[in-house]
Curated annotation (Swiss-Prot):
Protein name, entry field: 6,7-dimethyl-8-ribityllumazine synthase
Positions of 5-amino-6-(D-ribitylamino)uracil binding: 22, 57-59, 81-83, 114
Subunit annotation: Forms an icosahedral capsid composed of 60 subunits, arranged as a dodecamer of pentamers.
The family this protein is said to belong to: Belongs to the DMRL synthase family.
The entry's keywords: Riboflavin biosynthesis, Transferase
Organism: Wigglesworthia glossinidia brevipalpis
The protein's role, per its UniProt record: Catalyzes the formation of 6,7-dimethyl-8-ribityllumazine by condensation of 5-amino-6-(D-ribitylamino)uracil with 3,4-dihydroxy-2-butanone 4-phosphate. This is the penultimate step in the biosynthesis of riboflavin.
Pathway in which this enzyme or protein is active: Cofactor biosynthesis; riboflavin biosynthesis; riboflavin from 2-hydroxy-3-oxobutyl phosphate and 5-amino-6-(D-ribitylamino)uracil: step 1/2
Record gene name: ribH
Organism lineage: Bacteria, Pseudomonadati, Pseudomonadota, Gammaproteobacteria, Enterobacterales
Length: 154
């Protein structure tokens, strides 16, 4: 039996982070977590990390699609926060967003990690961006590193 598992260190990889400006007070924590993991665990240099700010989560997919066609990056990380309001707008965003991102990843054979929070309230978002429940930006970074390395050995 053969077992394959991607490692976390990927010091020569180039990563693009696409991050939403909306809810930036939360998203900046996600970004800090992602960058820390890429540098400290993945051993990436700052010059191998590119950050693209977009207005909101809905604008992330077009940049992901554009960057995936350039063959410049080994992996992409998406960061943002969608907090449930009084309408069902958040449900539409979450379903469509994930489907679009997953389709791009499969079509372009590029690891794309989703570090977008979908929460019921602001407290849940804060907890997932670096307090009680860890940092989902860091988790997204580790996931993309592992997938980059797994694809290299398959």
């Amino acid at each position: 039996m053969n077992t394959y598992e991607g490692k976390l260190q990927s010091k020569n990889s180039k990563i693009a982070i696409i991050i939403s400006r909306f809810n930036s007070f939360i998203n900046k924590n996600l970004l800090d977590g992602a960058i820390d993991s890429l540098k400290r665990i993945g051993r990436l240099k700052s010059e191998n990390i590119s950050i693209f700010w977009v207005p909101g989560v809905c604008e992330i997919p077009i940049i992901v699609n554009f960057l995936s066609k350039q063959n410049k990056y080994n992996g992409l990380i998406t960061l943002g926060t969608v907090i449930q309001g009084k309408t069902f707008h958040h449900e539409l965003i979450s379903k469509d967003f994930n489907n679009i991102i997953f389709n791009i990843s499969i079509k372009k054979n590029i690891p794309i990690s989703v570090g977008v929070l979908y929460t019921r309230n602001i407290n849940q978002a804060i907890e997932r961006s670096g307090t009680k429940l860890g940092n989902k930006g860091s988790d997204a970074a580790l996931s993309v590193l592992e997938m980059i390395n797994l694809l290299k050995i398959i």
